[in-house]
Amino acid sequence: MSETTQTSQSLYQALWNSADVLRSKMDANDYKSYLLGMVFYKYLSDKMLFFVSETMEEETESLEEALAVYRKYYEDEEIHEDLLAVITDEMSYAIHPDLTFTALVERVNDGSFQLEDLAQGFRDIEQSDELYENLFEDIDLYSKKLGATPQKQNQTVAAVMKELAVLDVAGHAGDMLGDAYEYLIGQFATDSGKKAGEFYTPQPVAKLMTQIAFLGREDKQGFTLYDATMGSGSLLLNAKRYSRQPQTVVYFGQELNTSTYNLARMNMILHGVPIENQFLHNADTLDEDWPTQEPTNFDGVLMNPPYSAKWSASSGFMDDPRFSPFGKLAPKSKADFAFLLHGYYHLKQDNGVMVIVLPHGVLFRGNAEGTIRKALLEEGAIDTVIGLPANIFFNTSIPTTVIILKKNRTNRDVYFIDASKEFDKGKNQNIMTDAHIEKILDAYKSREDMDKFAHLASFEEIVENDYNLNIPRYVDTFEEEEVEPLTEIVAKINQTNATIESQTASLLDMLGQLHGATPEADEELKAFVEAFKG
């Protein structure tokens, strides 16, 4: 397959096939960093080579030709410094010709490749600009997982690079490559199973959440979007699909896991998000607040936090403005409301929309959580509650709920949608289709009662239910069974009895034809038949 004829689907497949080299050596949660890191390095390398060709007005048909052009001008003492300055100014990095992905693959092919060359390439990128600082720190090229000896490690990495060499990643820059990267992340999530929840939100859920956040504001310039538990950044980057001004969206994200944080940084760059429009932070959302410098409040807040995580719940947090207005702290064993209150705190007063996914327990659990829920309801903060189907996430089979929050609402009613049956059965998971998502969105826009699907509950109704938001209290999905006439039931019983009598007679007839091998056995058999007759 030529580089220029690769479709996005074949690009996806080729990327995933390159993982075969690593799949037998470690689980997906480990090898994702290696593969995604090398894809990213190839992208930076290829992009730079083609940029040099364009800058020097040299036509090149392949990466090999582009590398030859780069070498020629790099080695020209008269323009060497100027060339590097132009590259660095445009790219924020420059790669030595011998350390480009294309040059390294040439060495793979002639058997002279050394791991240290790739490691040096990684270091050079990391040291070139703050944007790339520590970006490859999770990729241990000398790990025993890659092979028991340095030679084996060298062979494994070389094999992956050889697979990746055929990919036209620079030609697919922007959303196509970004989407291919998303595809890889999704495949890793499928392979990783339970561990996947920390870095990936399934696309159907992300689609629903993002469309809700942007509803009526698709044309807004400079839309600010915040995810305090951003994982790989997939949820944030859905904005590019639903904003009509995608290049003006400004992304704010925080992630505790360093490996996942680096994944999000790569994801942003591969999606072509301008550097000035991405503000990502590697820290614990439930520790010190972030961001604390303007802007601190956002047009949209999207969150899929780890469910029922533990946190310190230190008494000092009662003085924290994120939590203090709500009377209690989320319990130590369940940080769900701590995440929710953090996101809500960072929501804009006017027209801000927060969409968060949490387990159903937050809707009805008592004690501290009941106090927080009551305070939110009395403030009118909770706008809509959507019950999602069970088993649609990678990390849990439990049903989850999407909660939509807004500030400065004029009333305190809550709209309930029971979408628990809106799915198709998949091989390992339930799947929400576009039709299911549209049905939910249509209901959300209308805010009308729909039989066995949606209900607009007044604040008085919620108070009557003691601030319990369990969806079945508001949306009755009970299906009455059709009453069967007694005459039909009696007829069925008679038919069943007749069938039993007929089959019993047939069995007795067959038993009567049996004979024991000895007189004693024959007598025992006859006694059994008589006992069976009753």
Residue ranges and their predicted role:
Residues 2, 6, 288, 295-534:
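A conserved structural/catalytic subdomain of Rossmann-like adenosyl-cofactor enzymes
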Residues 195-303, 308-317, 323-329, 337-338, ...:
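Conserved S-adenosyl-L-methionine
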Residues 33, 193, 227-229, 249, ...:
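Short glycine- and Lys/Arg-enriched binding-loop motifs that mark or flank ligand-binding interfaces
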Residues 22, 216, 346-347:
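Hydrophobic helix-cap positions at the C-terminus of alpha-helices
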Residues 1-213, 276-285, 387-390, 412-420, ...:
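Non-catalytic, mostly N-terminal accessory regions of nucleic-acid modification and defense proteins
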Residues 119-123, 252, 274, 329, ...:
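Generic hydrophobic, helix-prone segments enriched in Leu/Val/Ile
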